[in-house]
Amino acid sequence: VRSASAMALARKAAASSMVLLKNANALLPLSKQTKRIALVGPLANNRAEVMGSWKARGEDKDVVTVLEGIKNKLGSGTEVNYVQGCDFLDPSTSEFSAALEAAKQSDVVIAVVGEKALMSGESRSRAVLRLPGKQEALLDTLRKAGKPLVVVLMNGRPLCLESVDKQADAMLEAWFPGTQCGNAVADVLFGDIVPAAKLTASFPLTEGQIPNNYNYKRSGRPGDMPYSSTVRHIDVPNRNLYPFGYGLSYTTFSYGEMQCPTAFDDKGFLPVSVDVTNTGNYDGEEIVQLYVADKVASMVRPVKELKGFQKVFIPKGQTKRVEFKLNVKDLGFWNNLMQYVVEP
């Protein structure tokens, strides 16, 4: 089970699942020549919790922590000063001063925060979806150092991260990465892997927005309209902090005009294509997503529906054509009579 190939696959799978949520001023990837790093947080040197809700099937001794992963990546040329800072649920702030001092002495601060493994999973509902315990207060303290702050998140569900987003310069959603946690996180933070993953669920601004499906009905949640509280929340926008399908990269991509014929072919398919160009400075993968919207129908339809996606590798400066084939049934829906219909 723990063969070299299995460990390499676990490392790649973990890194490939990580979603870059924020990257102000292109802070990431970090330079491998960074001299001093402050590493803080209850998940920065933790083995058991990073395996997630199936940790009973794993062995703590097999886990590479984030602290170990960064040291593996950078070697002795970089000083990594680790302070836990706080626990998940303990209200103590006794290590805040040490964490702040470490941050002040660093070139960059990496905070690894999130949930305990068994806070997620079956029968693990939470009413409040913010970071548990004193973790947000820890981030507020680290911000006072005035150094670039990278937040690595480990959690098993969407969280309400508006306050974290305001404090962080960069945010990486790592989920629960498993045994190769530290190596995978380091691969992404230091640019050996360019993030490409997208969110499979929306991250709300607040719990009061839930349910917040991306494919909500047009009449179910109207758009934000000024001076009217009848079509929106009165205290927050209707939008999510990070929507379904969202995810950044270290490189940039531009999309050409979508090519789509006006009719299906005789086999019931509609070919759709778009040219995607890597306009940034890194080779990278892009997940091209195809959505459809039925603007006029006999029933109220979702604002959009995902009908296809493809991950394509595009070297910097190059363009690739991405093609989809829509089936006529992809545009249908179940009506009030429980009949599956495709309307003109």
Model-flagged regions — what are they?
Residues R2-S3, N81-P148, V152-K166:
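Hydrophobic helix-and-loop "lid/oligomerization" segment in the mid-to-C-terminal part
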